[in-house]
């Protein structure tokens, strides 16, 4: 469950380290985002010579949450932290070329197959 002001880790090599959610996209009064949802973020911490810099406003897809995601069989997949992958504002394709850490099977839609293929592990 990601809401406005939530700090997230970045699970790719775009150059950002920490980001903050500034808007949950999809509906005018939508409050929370889960795994697979697109959010608007601003970069709070970045490494030198990265593809993005501090203060940039981008879109991101949530790939891991502490709240977890419930499967139809009743199991819940939870993680130790909240993480996202940065997306290009226009094409909504990943900015980074590598993904760090596992991602969930819920990302297997037409839009995020690139993230699934880059991820080292799909749970």
Curated annotation (Swiss-Prot):
It comes from the Bacteria. InterPro entries: Ribosomal_uL14 (IPR000218), Ribosomal_uL14_bac-type (IPR005745), Ribosomal_uL14_CS (IPR019972), Ribosomal_uL14_sf (IPR036853). Pfam families: Ribosomal_L14. GO terms for cellular component: cytosolic large ribosomal subunit. Gene3D superfamilies: Ribosomal protein L14. SMART domains: Ribosomal_L14. GO terms for biological process: translation. Keywords: Ribonucleoprotein, Ribosomal protein, RNA-binding, rRNA-binding. GO terms for molecular function: large ribosomal subunit rRNA binding; structural constituent of ribosome. The keyword Ribosomal protein applies. Binds to 23S rRNA. Forms part of two intersubunit bridges in the 70S ribosome. Belongs to the universal ribosomal protein uL14 family. Part of the 50S ribosomal subunit. Forms a cluster with proteins L3 and L19. In the 70S ribosome, L14 and L19 interact and together make contacts with the 16S rRNA in bridges B5 and B8. This is Large ribosomal subunit protein uL14. It comes from Cronobacter sakazakii (strain ATCC BAA-894). The lineage of its organism: Bacteria, Pseudomonadati, Pseudomonadota, Gammaproteobacteria, Enterobacterales. The gene is rplN.
